[in-house]
Amino acid sequence: MAKETFAPIQKLSPDDMAVKPNLHLSDSYDGFSWESMYEELDWLPGGGLNKAHEAIDRHANGKNRDKVAMIWEGKNGEREDYTFGDMKRLTNQFANVCQSLGIEKGDRVFIFMDRLPELYVACFGALKAGAVVGPLFSAFGPEPVRDRMKDSGAKVLVTQPDLRRKISGIIPELFDLQHILIANKDGRDPQPIDAQDLSYEEEMDKASNDFTTVETGQYDYSIMHYTS
């Protein structure tokens, strides 16, 4: 077998690059301070730190309320725009859903969905409720979902109809799991949900859009992401 040859590594000055970097590492490193980062954060009224507040509420509470925060484009060409105000309202509703299901600070809420708007609403809403969010790749089979859910002790799973059916065989093994929320976007899946499951849409419709974010701190867990 012929031996592969590779061109030698070339060390270039940023000024000699065809596409110049936005920042110089040495300059950025020398000028960085955590204190300056803290100054850019809004913080919770009680001095805590919460990702959902920093990503959504701080903007929704000010001049950016009607500015588009998220654009979703579906596989079939659909498009939905969500302002910061929309995201605050929806995530407040989901935070209330979490509390109605008994979720307390530090409890695990896992999300097994395609990249639908409901995924982001559930993620940030659960963070507002003080939960630790576990994202699950939608291409996972039953075993990776089971392993992560069992290890984490997740109490709530948010998923969609086809993915719920894919993992139906492992649900009895998840002894800590208390609730499954099924998000059936626009009613696209005609099959009824299982009797023990809850409709994401129905729970959201019942939930208030007024919520005070749970006081979380910068050293509290917020995301539980498994890698292989």
Pin down the residues of each PLM region.
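Helix N-cap/beta->alpha junction signal
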Residues: 113-115, 160-161, 220
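Conserved AMP-binding/adenylate-forming core of the ANL superfamily
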Residues: 66-124, 141-146, 199-202
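N-lobe entry segment of adenylate-forming
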Residues: 1-82, 86-99, 173-176, 186-192, ...
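Conserved S/T- and glycine-rich ATP-binding loop of Class I adenylate-forming
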Residues: 87, 109, 126, 157, ...
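Conserved pre-ATP/AMP-binding loop-to-beta segment of ANL
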Residues: 66-68, 182, 192, 196-197, ...
